[in-house]
């Protein structure tokens, strides 16, 4: 690399960037994702930068060459981008690379040499650039928290996420979506580390050297999109792994609990939280520090009687390369953090295997991680039911002809002319030309004695058929089927909707409702628009809720369990009340189910679901059984 003299560049502060321009910028790295393979053939890197204006800019950078993307090692590094195109994405400015894009990266620590990292053979760097880097360093030292996730193995604790700088000693392909890295950083973990069996694997590296280092070596499993990068790394290289997950794995149950605990290391699939791998050059300052640590490492003097090789082949906690389709521990770890569902509460609960849940009494709450083996009903429209929140009864939603018959059978008597035109409503009655001269009355509810606009008007209809009710509901705010009572209008029947708004029909519970006369709607005046809850309250109706009632068959490899899904509007983020009449929502629901329970492939390839389950007792006749229900769980945003 060499410097070239050129006319000074103009750099734009981040708060002055404009959509549609091409700019040169400096910034401090606030967040980044190391280069990863995008959905196409290019590599992608995401970088969020900030400058003295305290404005952030996220940049999406693509290149067919891994090395052409910014060489960023940690949060706090300083970058210079030339020819960055500014566009708007989701109402925020975003930077993307365009023709001629170039980048430099600098260590962000005050006092360190100002040395540029770049794959370019020539680049410009002036005294003014030097001043800008040093000014950003000083500003960042006061305003940006230094990255605290970089740790040594000796400081690693379970159930955390870390960045690790290390040297690669050996590697092996476990299967198409899992790859083993054996690494060290010169320090030893507090707990013994988990060992992956290499007996049936094609291993690259010096096993005798690894055996001499013994407990200074840890096994790391990387998954999915990281496998391609891991496969290309040469043994002996220095690495930084980002967002490495540590957790405890119980070992041999025959030993004491403290002796059997082992520390696992996993680099999960995906790029969330900046997860990834970066090869560090030998000239990097952090590699210099690592080399000193490796040279000064306290190597074990003697081997234990078991030795690493024996442990790798015989340790009960070791991972075997099973070719079966059963769910295995590493199969689950591979997909952690990319679950198709997320928890909205109770994240503190520890995960419980299904085999343990099936042996315990109810009621209990559990956190599980499993795959959706199957579900019922297969016709998703049949899953929409009506649930009473008070008595918990469930009933079918009346459809088409059945609803029309309910309206027809309930409206057998002609409207009572004495109940026309009260202070509450204005009435209009007409007689149909066919159908035996059926009389239909429409009562327009007033607001403070005045008829409101149709978009705000509630109308009461007597003697109407489904086609007439549907036509009126498309033109007026709300429609209520009623009949003439002895002294005033009454709700038609709770077999029919008590309120219709657009295409949505609102029903009430026959068992729990205590109906009041229509005149009670007077209590709703001056209280805003007509809502199902306010109308139900005024008329003594306990409204039924639209829910998806489904049965999920869950499988985590230890057991199979059937669980009800009732809190499904929260789960799917789709209103159950609208899915029956909205083709787009039906397609969305089908898409979600196809993603969490894909047709035409083996269960092994299904995504994992992280769910909360609650168990409860149910008595049916003389039989007492335990049922399970999914709660406080929702489909992840990338699935919806």
Swiss-Prot record:
Keywords: Chromosome, DNA-binding, Nucleus, Telomere. This is Protection of telomeres protein 1. GO terms for molecular function: single-stranded telomeric DNA binding; telomeric DNA binding. Component of the telomerase ribonucleoprotein (RNP) complex that is essential for the replication of chromosome termini. Is a component of the double-stranded telomeric DNA-binding TRF1 complex which is involved in the regulation of telomere length by cis-inhibition of telomerase. Also acts as a single-stranded telomeric DNA-binding protein and thus may act as a downstream effector of the TRF1 complex and may transduce information about telomere maintenance and/or length to the telomere terminus. SMART domains: Telo_bind. One of its GO terms (biological process) is positive regulation of telomere maintenance. It is found in: Nucleus; Chromosome, Telomere. Belongs to the telombin family. It comes from Mus musculus (Mouse). Gene3D superfamilies: Nucleic acid-binding proteins. GO terms for cellular component: chromosome, telomeric region; nuclear telomere cap complex; nucleoplasm; shelterin complex. PANTHER family: PROTECTION OF TELOMERES 1, PROTECTION OF TELOMERES PROTEIN 1.
């Amino acid at each position: 690399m060499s410097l070239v003299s050129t006319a000074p560049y103009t750099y734009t502060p981040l708060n002055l960037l404009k959509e549609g321009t091409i700019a040169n910028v400096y910034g401090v790295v606030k967040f980044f994702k190391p280069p990863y393979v995008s959905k196409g053939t290019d590599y992608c890197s995401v970088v969020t930068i900030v400058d003295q204006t305290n404005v952030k800019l996220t940049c999406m950078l693509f290149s067919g060459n891994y090395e052409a993307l910014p060489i960023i090692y940690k949060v706090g590094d300083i970058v210079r981008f030339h020819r960055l195109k500014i566009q708007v994405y989701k109402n925020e400015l975003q930077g993307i690379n365009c023709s001629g894009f170039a980048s430099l990266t600098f260590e962000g620590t005050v006092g360190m040499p100002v040395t540029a990292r770049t794959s370019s053979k020539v680049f410009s760097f002036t005294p003014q650039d030097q001043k800008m880097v040093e000014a950003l360093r000083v500003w960042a030292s006061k305003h940006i928290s230094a990255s605290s996730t970089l740790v040594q193995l000796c400081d690693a604790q379970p159930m955390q996420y870390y960045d690790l700088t290390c040297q690669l000693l050996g590697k092996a392909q476990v299967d198409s979506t899992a790859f083993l890295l054996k690494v060290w950083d010169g320090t030893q973990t507090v707990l013994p580390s988990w060992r992956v069996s290499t007996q049936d694997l094609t291993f690259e590296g010096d096993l005798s050297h690894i055996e001499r280092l013994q407990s200074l070596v840890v096994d790391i499993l990387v998954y999915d999109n990281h496998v391609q990068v891991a496969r290309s790394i040469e043994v002996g290289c220095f690495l930084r792994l980002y967002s490495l997950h540590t957790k405890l794995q119980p070992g041999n149950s025959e030993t004491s609990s403290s002796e059997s605990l082992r520390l696992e290391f996993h680099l999960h699939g995906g790029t969330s939280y900046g997860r990834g791998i970066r090869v560090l050059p030998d000239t990097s300052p952090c590699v210099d520090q690592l080399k000193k640590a490796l040279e000064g490492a306290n190597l074990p003097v003697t081997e234990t009687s078991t030795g690493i090789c024996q442990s790798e082949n015989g340790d009960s906690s070791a991972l075997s390369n099973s070719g079966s389709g059963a769910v295995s521990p590493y199969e689950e770890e591979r997909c952690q953090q990319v679950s198709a569902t997320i928890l909205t509460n109770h994240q503190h609960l520890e995960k419980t295997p299904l085999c343990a849940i099936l042996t315990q009494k109810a009621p209990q709450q559990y956190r599980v991680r499993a795959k959706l083996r199957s579900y019922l009903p297969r016709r998703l429209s049949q899953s929409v039911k009506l649930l009473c929140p008070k008595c918990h009864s469930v009933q079918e939603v009346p459809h088409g002809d059945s609803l029309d018959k309910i309206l027809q059978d309930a409206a057998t008597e002609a409207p009572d002319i004495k109940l026309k035109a009260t202070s509450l409503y204005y009435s209009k009655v007409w007689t149909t030309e066919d159908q035996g001269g059926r009389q239909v009355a429409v009562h327009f509810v007033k607001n403070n004695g005045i008829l409101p606009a149709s978009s705000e008007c509630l109308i009461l209809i007597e003697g109407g058929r489904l086609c007439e009710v549907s036509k009126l509901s498309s033109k007026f705010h709300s429609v209520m089927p009623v009949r003439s009572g002895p002294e005033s209008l009454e709700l038609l029947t709770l077999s029919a909707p008590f309120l219709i708004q657009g295409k949505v029909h609102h029903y009430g519970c026959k068992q729990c409702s205590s109906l009041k006369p229509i005149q009670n709607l007077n209590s709703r005046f001056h209280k805003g628009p007509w809502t199902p809850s306010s109308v139900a309250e005024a008329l003594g109706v306990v409204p039924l809720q639209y829910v998806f009632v489904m049965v999920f068959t869950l499988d985590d490899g230890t057991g199979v369990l059937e669980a009800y899904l009732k809190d499904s509007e929260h789960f799917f983020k789709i209103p159950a009340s609208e899915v029956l009449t909205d083709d787009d929502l039906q397609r969305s629901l089908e898409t979600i189910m196809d993603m969490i329970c894909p047709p035409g492939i083996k269960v092994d390839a299904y995504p994992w679901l992280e769910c909360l389950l609650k168990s409860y007792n149910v008595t049916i006749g003389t039989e007492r059984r335990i049922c399970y229900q999914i709660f406080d769980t929702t489909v992840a945003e990338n699935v919806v």
